[in-house]
Amino acid sequence: MSKLFPNATIRTSAPYRFDIVGSFLRPETLKQARHQCSCGDISCADLTQVEDAEIAKLVEHQKNVGLRAVTDGEFRRTFWHLDFLAALDGVKEVDAEKFSVQFKHDNVRPKTLKIVDKIGFSESHPFVEHYRSLQKMAGETEVKLTIPSPSMLHLICTVRATDYQPIERYKDNNQLLLDDIADAYIDAMNIFYKLGCRNLQLDDTSWGEFCAEDKRKTYTERGLDLNQIAKDYVYMLNKIVAAKPADLAITMHICRGNFRSTWFSAGGYEPIAETLFGHCNVDGFFLEYDSDRAGDFKPLRFIKNQQVVLGLITSKSGELENCDEIIARIKEAAQYVDINQLCLSPQCGFASTEEGNILTEEQQWKKLEFIRSIVEEVWGK
């Protein structure tokens, strides 16, 4: 029973009161193996063996810390998003002069995406085998699959890209592009569902950009209608949710950038709150709330019956927050959303790219133990 909220209860389905965004710091052995593979010193098969061994350790560590659903830490990825998107049918990863967004105080390797054919998803996508492998390692424990939101493909290829030229199929037909992307995700969802997936998280930085005044100004000056783009993205998400099996939970994580503890967007949720929270039918939102860059809780007034996973604990630093302050912020959020619609997690993953954030593995796990202790105090064991 909760010590603070008499009516607070635990949850037995995703998202959980104690949850995570998904990525973890890569162990040095994995970083070394990836470097050796890129240099040709070991084979891809050798790298996979190292990945398998490290993911198996990670899965056990997640179980031991009390997580109800485990991830592979995104250990097989370079980026949180490009690896998945570039392997879609009709998409190609290309070099770029600069990364599509500028992080504060740091630079990312310049890669981007191009749409070269009809968008689709096939069973040859490498994430299918990755999921099978993780499912075996997890055993009876639930697996959580994290992939970039469909919005990200459209954002990178058409909105951020100032030189975007649609292929013939999508010329003067953005609606067809939106539908093809959504249909590809529905195909992916169904394939993963057949493999046992019941917990799917869509990671998304588009909404973080749409919260930022400077980003909104830049896009508007280019003649882009951000309000319509936001509605288009909700359309894609709702088309996917409408096609999902009843026992599959689909959540979305909204991010403002997470590369080596840096960020690229700032601004509260108010500009997107009514469109996203009021109309998007996902089962839950993982929301960054670890700094004043995320604004206050007032935008949560648009939440309907979804779960809101409060990202009150930063993953950008190893320093532990003050427990009383975190509980006070949960109480503040509960003024807008019922306590039984709230959960707690880190603000983002610990390593959205293979470089990872600036903290140690020990600090990473202490963060999760800290979150679990707060969850037990607020919602009970």
Predicted regions: what they are:
Residues S2-K381:
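Domain-level signal for soluble alpha/beta catalytic cores
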